[in-house]
């Protein structure tokens, strides 16, 4: 343990910025400072995101001097895979270790339309949702843009073996994305850029628990990214019980921000609604939810919850899920039930990391 601590301390003291944190224009600016032509930025991005090399020596069309400058200035290492769990349905959950010893989760989900990745934006989470394993242990730190980018790069490297690609992504992993707004936006722009992994903006979804000021800010961004709200309750009292953030950002104010976003962007918003047995899954809850969303351009995604040992919530019975869905549909709400994936592995958000933390403290 003492050796591990010393190694992590050394990593912190000697850490260079990640090259994966740089957007193309930032790389061009750096090259200009080094007296190098800016077209080299495109070549560097090609090595990073198309060929996905792991060291600067492989960047054969760059001069030795430029490779040395890159090596002296930026870290090219990505993430260390601690655990890789594969479900019977093809879902793969990765537990990655960061340079400072913290760990994060990333999930690859396979669909008929392609491969989707769920990325993490923070080590832990401060929001405190009572149903989520991600909040166990609290928030440790924000991820850098490059650490979020590296999750996609590492998963894409795993897919390279079978000549597959990441075709879409959701920012719904550990942490509150809008609490790490600048790094989130840097990540999205790098991944979306044609010189990056070039995942289309409309194939990316960002989810928030409801940080209202950032919703207004997000509405002004120029990326056509899908937007989702973790709602989980049809009224303020129940939402405050499930999601303490509702005490700071009240549901009526949240709905006003959502309406502004929809009117400003013209885009439909998705409401994520986890179903918790006996808590928020009754017909009266569905009726109340339909009334809350009346007139809002939206889609509701019903989520049968994964069981989390550290929490007391139970799964809603299958027939009750269908009744909830029917109640919404009968009232004109666009709704679907999320297909469960990774049910036979630690699929709940933060669950694999929580298990690893338990092992570390034994």
From Swiss-Prot:
This is Probable dual-specificity RNA methyltransferase RlmN. It is found in: Cytoplasm. Keywords: 4Fe-4S, Cytoplasm, Disulfide bond, Iron, Iron-sulfur, Metal-binding, Methyltransferase, rRNA processing, S-adenosyl-L-methionine, Transferase, tRNA processing. Disulfide bonds join 118-349. The gene is rlmN. Reaction proceeds by a ping-pong mechanism involving intermediate methylation of a conserved cysteine residue. Its main location: cytoplasm. Residues 111-344 form the Radical SAM core domain. It comes from Bacillus anthracis (strain CDC 684 / NRRL 3495). Specifically methylates position 2 of adenine 2503 in 23S rRNA and position 2 of adenine 37 in tRNAs. Its EC number is 2.1.1.192. One of its GO terms (molecular function) is 4 iron, 4 sulfur cluster binding. Its cofactor is [4Fe-4S] cluster. S-adenosyl-L-methionine binds at residues 175-176, 207, 230-232, 306. [4Fe-4S] cluster binds at residues 125, 129, 132. InterPro entries: Aldolase_TIM, Methyltransferase_A, RlmN_N, RNA_MTrfase_RlmN, rRNA_lsu_MTrfase_RlmN/Cfr, rSAM.
